[in-house]
Structure formats: structure tokens, C-alpha cells
Amino acid sequence: SLDRLMGQNYIGRTGDTYNFLTDEEQDIQKEINLTQVDTGAIVGDIAKIIFGMIYDAKKFRYGKCDFPFDQMVDNTMYGIATGGMRLRFLTAASDATEKTEFRLMNSSKGSEAIVVLGDTPYYESLEASMKIRKYVKQRNVSQMPKSAQDIIRGQQEEAAKYEAEASKALVEAIENAKFYADGEHLDIKSGNAKAKIDQTMEYLVSHVYSKLDLIGKNADTDAEIMAVLSGADVVFAEADPNRDAEAAVEEYLEMQAMKHLPTSMADVQSKLSSIP
């Protein structure tokens, strides 16, 4: 088969075309195949593609609010941790024990969304690309014979194609993924990769910040806030769209008073804007 011949370095691939290799090409191909690349580096590149190209939002907008979230691939954090909600992708490199239904539902309970990537060749494509890049970096290519330089130039072009294939395969892997949030396996059938992640995050936010729906009307400007604080915006209790939210604030203040604890506006904001 073609895979067996490639594994034995008898043939090479250029795009969708396979060619028999010369002795020199076989030697270089063999050295590339024997080049070791770190799993963590591959996972890091997966994270760059997912969070840098496919889903590059740093915050998720729900209604009129923006919610920051931590970005992870397997057990590797991407970017700066916020300590709040988390969006995590599990790749082909993750341990199989992490992908059992029980483990996924248990791990996502609380404030995490987990996306178990579908079975596409994104990992193999990135690994092949990284082997070529590392091999070239370790060689003094300019001092090699022209024939070898030409071969390596072709390999570098192939590496770029592998990277493009990996990006496309990752999109497909998300579209065919399994989605979990707050302890539930979500049934998300429609939408592209970004839309499916959005649906997962929407479910997570609505369950983590379970009191968001208490707010019936947002104050969008400083003038609206001042009108409320000064009493200029008078609304009867029965018609107050925020009466449930106000009751939650009052309950918190009463509990603080019972404990004889001083409470600042910053305390109120911290309490009511953090994860319950």
C-alpha cells in the first residue's frame, strides 16, 4: 500500500501526488521521519490554530455582558488564566481515560466546557510538518549540495501544505466533536465550528451565571445609572423589570449586616459579578 511504501521511504508525497524517491531523497526522507518532535509542541500548535484562527474570542458575549474564559488544549493553558470559566479541547494526544462519558461529565461540572475533537488527521499533519521544520533547522542547508537544497526546499513547501491541511482538519474535528458543559453532554447538531462552540459557551454561561435572567433591563449609560441612584427614575415595584435582581442584592446586604461586616460597592460588585 502507499502508506507502507511511504513508511519505508520508497515514495514521497507532493500534495495528492505520490512519487518514487531517488536514493538522496530517500535518505533525507528517512532522516526527517526519524526526527523527534515533542507532543507538547504539537499541542501548542493546535492551540494556536484553534484560539488564534478558528475561535479567537477572548470573551464570550451573552446578552449585553462579556464573560472572560480560560483557554486550554488538553492540560495546557493557552494565554493568561482568568480563574473563571474554561473552554478546553481534548485532542488525539490526550489520555483515553479522560474521554470516558463519566469523566467528561464529571470534569465539566461547574464552570467548564469541554470539546472532544472528532477523528480527523490534524495531529498527524502537524506532526509531519514539525518534523520537517525541525530537521531543516538542525541542518546547515546553505552548505549542502544543490540537489539536497532542492529536495529540502520541496520538503518545506510540503510542510506548509501539511499546516494548511491541519487547520482544515481541525475545523472538521470541531464540527464532528462531542460537546460537554456543566456536567451535561450537549446535543449540538447544526452549525459550523464557531457556531457550535458558541452554543456550548452559551449553555455554560447561562448555567454558571444562573441569576443573569434576574436582570430585566440594563442601565446602558451613566445618565441611566444616575437616574436610578437619584430616584429620578421611579418605577412601581410590580412593574420594576429588575425587582428580582434588587431582591438578590438586598438579601446579600442583609446577610452582611447580620454578620456585622462592612460592605462596600466593590464588595457588592465582586459578589454579584463572580461565579456563584
What positions do the PLM features span?
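Extended alpha-helical interface modules used as scaffolds for assembling large macromolecular complexes
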Residues: 1-276
